[in-house]
Amino acid sequence: TLTEFYIEVEGKEPGTEALKKIEEKAYAMTRKDTHQAMEGFIHNLNTMHSRGGNQVVFSSINYGTDTSPEGRMVIEELLKATIEGLGTRGEVPVFPIQIFKVKDGVSYSEEDYKKAMENFEAALEGKMEFQAPNFDLFLKACRTTAKALFPNFMFLDTPYNKNEKWDIKDPKRYRYELATMGCRTRVYENIAGEKSSLGRGNLSFT
């Protein structure tokens, strides 16, 4: 633990202030590492060629509803890396195709929207508290789209995208969330079992 590590290094129990500084430094280092990982993720998917050799891998990533601290950090740093772009000229990365999932009560609420519109700059700068835990990420996603074309947006509350088993209290609720591919393919319904996007894909188009 942090306390045990501090005792080993300093030879005494850490105070509240010391623990706070340790936590802040660890958090900053983790954020930096996460950002570099997202930069590498985008770079690799725009430079690694498929086995055909004539194009990069057509890849997609869906996100927006993970409210855990680590999940939110990954989303935020991915958005930042997308705005930064590729190389010294900051070229817009084509891949992965990014899809931000909009879900009422998670990444959107009408009340939060109205509040943000009263002072949009303050909302973007993180100076407001919102009801929906990921509404701030939704705003950052909109800003990213305005600058870098991605992410696209998918609305999980659209009647044909809803899953009656989705529960905000379920830590594995992602199993009941629709995910799409960048080619706009929506693989979700299932005539032979439970509808889900997990483990699904295309073999051919019909």
Task: Describe the predicted segments one by one.
Residues 1-206:
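Conserved catalytic cores of very large enzyme subunits
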